[in-house]
Amino acid sequence: MQKRKKNLLKFCNKIGCDTLVAFEPENLFYMTGFWGEAIGVLNKSGTTIIAPELEVGRAKEESVDCKVIKSERGKGALSTLISKLKGAKVCTDSTNYDVIQSMKKSLPIVKPSTDPFYRAREIKDLQEISILKKASSILDEMYELCVDEIKIGQSELELQTVLMSYAMERGMFATGYKSTLNPLIIAGGPNGALPHAQVTKRKFTGGDMIVVDLTLRYQGYVSDATRTFGLGFISTEAKKVYEIVKQSQEAGLRAVRAKASCKSVDDACRKIIQKKGYGKYFIHSTGHGIGLEVHELPCISYLSKTKLEKNMAITVEPGIYLPNKFGVRIEDSLIVKDRADVMHKFTKDLIII
């Protein structure tokens, strides 16, 4: 935790500030070890948590090397915060206009920026990597469960219920990802052509390609993987598309290494799909950072100017989406080393159930 705090302050100092103020729960947790309704303050003097009475007990119990101060909620918490920041040059992750203006009235420098938080969180420490690997192993177990459970006549919603029950029994929970209403993406047949498909009551039928994207939180950290299964008699086209996506993902994984550009990983995946004539059906970036949030830095995209660094945690997830027909996506979470340290062991060969 001390190394994390040192890194946070290093990035804070780079933008001309000496104090970090965290409102977002992910940043609060990274800074303090406590996830809840509170404000975190970090400077060279130490770390303080400003929390309402209902959170004080848990904040004291769960935080690491933090002073916990009780406050009122809302404006009361902001008043307590400002009173503790006299003369501070503040960087905050808040985007709330009223909060920022109130701070600016009382403090010499207030910079709204998530950059110090995201830059520090980009590189995972050994504890974070250990948690991510455990989370990934549970997702592998869930894919084994898919092989046993998926059947003709089962609905996407029914499969999600089975999988979430298994996950929650093992300490994994939904991430609160804002692009979907459901905790998982389970998309059969034509629904699979929608990368962020909502889980529906549609029942699986013979010939379906079924995209199962598992993105779940374990001890605060998110693991993310996707496998696509076939059900019954699978068309020649579906098998062909699956093999192209598999080759694309393998090329992307081979391109991953410390000091390689994020763009080069995207290029490696995209060239395979384009060469096979499906380029216009690969409609998203190749991957993203993972950690305390589903999508973190870096972005694995043809637009990215970032170079990979050792111990970044990223995904590689090419896909082909044929409207009104089916989709195929294959995704792994991995740790960047001299090569890709893939955290998932479940096969990427096409399984036809």
Residue positions per predicted region:
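Active-site neighborhoods and metal-handling regions in enzymes and metal-associated proteins
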Residues: M1-I353
